[in-house]
């Protein structure tokens, strides 16, 4: 750790972060400089106060697992917070644990051609807000040609403004547990399975 950077070499294949790893950083961006990375496994209660998490262009990445209570914010530092995962050709599965990404404003998955499964445990992306403060909050999943299953746990995305699924031609199953997207303002299904 160098003040505000997590330094990872380009030749590693697995990034495994133990529980309670909380460097003093506000953003975590993993991009195409990590050309060999195949697995990301982040433990419990990690990266508190990180308000921007981006994975972009990791073409060898196959699996992303984030355990319980990681990437959590509070109301005061949640403005503009986002989780963006895109342009990862080999990513097959995403599993996000209970109570992770609390107070985050957006979750976007884009251009993940090998992704087959998304599993979000209960209360992921929980944002207890009101009509006035939910503006811009969204869950967007698009351009994932092989995505078959989406499971979103209880209470996730509570009060979010929109839930959008676009261009998911292989989607077979969407399971939304109790209170998922409760009080969601807009739901869009576009260019889905024929």
Say what each PLM segment does.
Residues 38, 59-62, 87-95, 111-117, ...:
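Tandem repeat domain/solenoid detector
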